[in-house]
Every structure is written in structure tokens, then in C-alpha cells.
């Protein structure tokens, strides 16, 4: 069973994952983060991301897809939607966009349940983007 939360930054995904951990305990494995470990390696994230960042994120989603009986904070939906936004802003090239798109199509059906989390009021935690326009763009792309 593969379950994931998806949504913009500041939409409650991490809070819901923590609630799942508290409730289900060791009945599932958990993927807490995808993007922040990449940021800790020095790559820019969110609206500042580029080809290297998005490829690393898509690669992480491919690795997470190999897990079974897992609940994840994000999934390939997020990787694709953020890459799509960056492509529209000419921050990633067509090759990176195509990689995200083909990976999305290759692994999306492996997910059993995807919960979409609606955006909440922005809260600065020191890492997430607090750009409300960016959040709205991502939310709009996710609802298409």
C-alpha cells in the first residue's frame, strides 16, 4: 500500500503525516521529506529551483516508489507540478520537464491513495517558500 499527501507548501501534509505515525505506528514506513534534504545539500528549492534540483527531486520520488506499505509527505504529483511551474517560468529546460512528465506517467498508478491538502495561511518556518503568489500558482496547477 502506497499512500501520499500532496499539496502546496503550508497545506498540512507534515502535520497529517505525524498524525498517521502517531496512530499507525510501525504498521507503515514513512517518508517525511523529499525537498528539504535536497535543500540541505545546497540546492535551491521552490520557486528558486532549477534543473539539478528538480532532477534530484524526481529521482527521490523514483526511489520512494520502490517502497511498499508507506505513507509519504509528498509524491510524484508534487514533483511534476513544481517542475511544470518552473518550466513555464523558464527555470528548467525541456529535458527536465520531460523527465518529470514521463516519470509522473510511469509511476502515478503505483500510488494507491493520494490525499490532496488544500493550501492554508502561509507560515514561515525558515525553509518553505512564503510567496503567496507561488503557492496560489501551484495550487491552481494541482487542481487542473
What is each PLM-predicted segment?
Residues 2:
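Walker A (P-loop) ATP-phosphate-binding motif of ABC ATPase nucleotide-binding domains
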Residues 5:
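Hydrophobic anchor at the beta1->P-loop junction of P-loop NTPases
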Residues 9:
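The conserved Walker
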Residues 13:
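Conserved lysine of the Walker
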Residues 18-63:
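Conserved substrate/cofactor phosphate-moiety recognition/catalytic segment
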Residues 33, 73-76, 115-121:
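Short loop/turn segments at strand-loop or loop-helix junctions that form parts
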Residues 52-109:
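Glycine-rich phosphate-binding loop used to anchor ATP phosphates in small-molecule kinases
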Residues 87-142:
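A glycine- and Lys/Arg-enriched "phosphate-lid" helix/loop adjacent to the NTP-binding pocket
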Amino acid at each position: 500500500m502506497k499512500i501520499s499527501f500532496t499539496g502546496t507548501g503550508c497545506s498540512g501534509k507534515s502535520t497529517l503525516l505525524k498524525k498517521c505515525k502517531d496512530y499507525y505506528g510501525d504498521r507503515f514506513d514513512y517518508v517525511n521529506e523529499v525537498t528539504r534534504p535536497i535543500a540541505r545539500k545546497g540546492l535551491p528549492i521552490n520557486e528558486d529551483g532549477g534543473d539539478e534540483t528538480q532532477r534530484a527531486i524526481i529521482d527521490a520520488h523514483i526511489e520512494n516508489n520502490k517502497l511498499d506499505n508507506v505513507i509519504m509527505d509528498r509524491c510524484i504529483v508534487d514533483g511534476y507540478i513544481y517542475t511544470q511551474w518552473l518550466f513555464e517560468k523558464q527555470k528548467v529546460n525541456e529535458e527536465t520537464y520531460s523527465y518529470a512528465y514521463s516519470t509522473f506517467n510511469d509511476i502515478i498508478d503505483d500510488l494507491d491513495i493520494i490525499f490532496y491538502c488544500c493550501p492554508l495561511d502561509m507560515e514561515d518556518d525558515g525553509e518553505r517558500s512564503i510567496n503567496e503568489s507561488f503557492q496560489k500558482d501551484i495550487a491552481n496547477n494541482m487542481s487542473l
